Design a protein with these regions (language model features):
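Append "and occasionally in soluble cytosolic enzymes with long acidic Gly/Pro-rich linkers
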Residues: 1-85, 161, 181
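Solvent-exposed loop/turn segments at secondary-structure junctions
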Residues: 5-9, 18-21, 71-75, 101-103, ...
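Structural recognition of the beta-strand scaffold that forms the well-ordered cores
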Residues: 1, 11-13, 65-68, 95-98, ...
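Conserved structured core elements
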Residues: 4, 8, 29, 33, ...
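Short, solvent-exposed loop/beta-turn-alpha elements that line the ligand-binding surface or hinge
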Residues: 20-34, 49-63, 108-113, 133-164, ...
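Bilobed periplasmic-binding protein-like "clamshell/Venus-flytrap" ligand-binding domains
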Residues: 44-70, 117-120, 167-206
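Periplasmic binding protein-like
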Residues: 88-142
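Sec-exported extracytoplasmic/periplasmic mature domains
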Residues: 3-7, 15, 19, 37-45, ...
Length: 232
């Protein structure tokens, strides 16, 4: 809805466009009834009515959180609103808080004063090592259990081991196996919830010769020295 179909739903952390390294994971389908069942099995209770349900924990506390989003990105603000509406159907109250980018970055990168954040992650190249700054437990860009002197969990320690192993491995298949295990761990633990991979599109005049857009940045000008305009 918010991206006009110009995106691919994600089942894992890596875009399926990264065909060399992305692991094909089972799709996560929208299933409201299954979500309700899982919440009830976990001990939550639903109060209110069908039009305005209220989800509460076993102690009677209302399930609610604030979702911060950079106000400069209208698409992400719209996505946050869709998330808010979807979770309301389960009785979960979400307060969407659009923030100026500087304040958004301060909270997500410095003070960590937020419940949940809607952000984007991009890498400069498809190689697995380019994801290390976000996945490695000691990285300043690591969003869950931040600023770790050592891994807080066994599964994060395992990811650290796998990232180090694939970085020193010269065999492509063994590198792929290690990075696939990283993706399986992330899909199981779900420290971040993947939503979509946005599509990139470029438009150029037919008069431009040698235009060959790339999937990597800079998408349109990587071969700038070869581009020229064919005069009529």
């Amino acid at each position: 809805i918010t991206l006009q179909g110009l995106a691919t739903p994600l089942a894992g952390f890596i875009s399926p466009g990264n065909r060399a390294w992305a692991l094909q994971l089972p799709a996560i389908d929208y299933d409201l009834e299954k979500a309700r069942t899982l919440l009830l099995e976990a001990g939550f209770v639903v109060q209110g009515n069908q039009e305005q349900p209220e989800l509460r924990d076993a102690k009677g506390n209302r399930v609610e959180f604030t979702l911060i989003v950079p106000v400069e990105s209208s698409a992400r603000v719209q996505m946050a609103t869709v998330i808010q509406e979807d979770l309301a159907r389960l009785g979960i109250k979400v307060q969407v808080a659009p923030l100026e980018f500087g304040e958004f970055q301060r909270r997500t990168m410095q003070t960590y004063e937020y419940d949940a954040a809607l952000l984007g992650v991009s890498v400069s190249e498809p190689d697995p090592s380019s994801y290390a700054n976000f996945l490695r437990s000691s990285s300043p860009l690591h969003q869950w259990h931040p600023k770790q002197s050592k891994p807080s969990t066994d599964w994060e320690a395992r990811i650290d081991e796998l990232l180090a192993a694939q970085a020193r491995e010269s065999n492509p298949e063994r590198r792929r196996e290690a990075f696939h295990e990283v993706q399986r761990i992330l899909a199981d633990q779900l420290p971040v919830i993947p939503i979509v991979a946005r599509h990139s599109a470029s438009v150029v005049s037919r008069r431009v010769v040698n235009y060959r857009p790339s999937v990597l940045m800079p998408y349109s000008l990587w071969n700038a020295e070869e581009l020229f305009v064919d005069q009529p």
